[in-house]
């Protein structure tokens, strides 16, 4: 979304009995992955809160999380000039002086949209099904319920929506949970835009299994007063429903119905008003269209203008939008903008805090040092820590609304605007500016980036959504369960505790990207869906199941099992102390290897029994070898197949399959009785 703003003189327009029940609100065919019981430690040491911190699933009221989902990376962008070099972070890394000169050679003359940094999945386009599947998986794992589709600038992305919604239906048909969707329209001929959405999707009952309902009707976020918007005021709204017979033929079914007789519309049609639950949504200014906006009835915000002291001094409860006097909606953003719409020319970035504002920027327009309130520490490279994001979450959690809106997931690009010489921007005089995002500090993105802050903001979002919604207790294994490693797998039928993973995440990639780029990924191989663990008197046994028959064990990086035996993320290889199947001796014998931190390598620890047949695999490890010999213990584990390498946890995120997804782990808790 591009929010067009005025700057300077410019108009820049959930107790578990058998841990295998389904969530009733997801439907009988949806397979519960229990992602709210997964554990993780992110790149800066923050951990996923468990039931001990969050409490049980909170059922005191509706608790819904929506996220702004961008689809403007359209297919035509593939034809842009190659090679693609419109990446602000890479431009400034080459020559930081480019930040001062709009005519610098590194600013491509034919590029008006720039990435602030490279996405983890490359410079993708919105019809890339591989990316869409990754997005849906990440968002549902984190607890996101609804995608807010962007129509804020009066552009319909019909082709992109078609691919996205069809992909969501495929993922749903595979038994996975998926979010719902709704639309947000605001600027331009918004009445026409909304009518076209209604006519082509809702009236045609397209993708109705994916519609998001609020107060028993599909939700539409819109502009309740089309005479006031961010693109300059009223524009004509042609009526898509108009036809002459409705005005002239008494026998016509719509005779004298103003929804059909007006060539231009000055208000939304009755069918739109009756069909949807409507909520006005725009930026959280203190005043908008001549009256107070923030904290008022039915006026949702997609962020708060914290550069305005009137808003900065409001309590969490005062920031909330209400409906019939009840706290309804709050916004959470990772940052704001490189511009503030105030007399202060400094932006509000990811390291901005209520106490200290934006840290001093270096020659790359990045903060080198900043205060992190939730740590009560000053940190180097503060952008890694999400100071603004956490303050935003803290306020929203205290306000405790029914709907949390997060802005945004995947916008990535922004327009570069030329300015007159000596125009104030980012605390200096400059000849150009970016409004919505600029670099790694000044952006509102959460989707993981390549390098930089990586998936820190995604993990931070998942941590806080769990605090908002609560979570289920991690199931506990009681007593001994002996399993014979014989390739028959019958012992496992009585083990009711399942650790589950997404079905279909070995999908292969073959898609166009920005400016001639083409992305392929055929690493998806063994699609892991279920695993189990059993503790015997002397051994711990593991079982794993895939969708289809296993590929041969001689394949590279085949069905690796990683174990954090000491439950300490700071030891071993990113917390993992042992790995199984890194070296396989035969189809019945594999190895247990232990990580040697001093050598920085995996070393042989023991040979262990393994059997696999069709889509089932089992193996057994001595408890003594894992240092798990007591009457109770806890350890974390994950399966991964065909990662490109074992460089860091992100190595497990993009290639092959990992169960559970990304850097999440399953937690196994056992006691003797």
Where do the language-model regions lie?
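N-terminal carbohydrate-binding/catalytic regions of secreted carbohydrate-active enzymes
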Residues: 48-163, 407-408, 412-446
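The substrate-binding groove and active-site-proximal loops of carbohydrate-active enzymes
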Residues: 38-42, 113-128, 144-155, 179-191, ...
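N-terminal module-boundary/linker segments of secreted carbohydrate-active enzymes
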Residues: 21-74, 209-211, 227-240, 252, ...
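Aromatic-rich peripheral "rim/lid" segments of glycoside hydrolase catalytic domains that contact
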Residues: 170-171, 418-489
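Short, well-ordered beta-strand segments enriched in hydrophobic/aromatic residues
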Residues: 487, 538-548, 617-623
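Aromatic-lined glycan-binding groove of carbohydrate-active enzymes
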Residues: 52, 58-78, 223-386, 396-397, ...
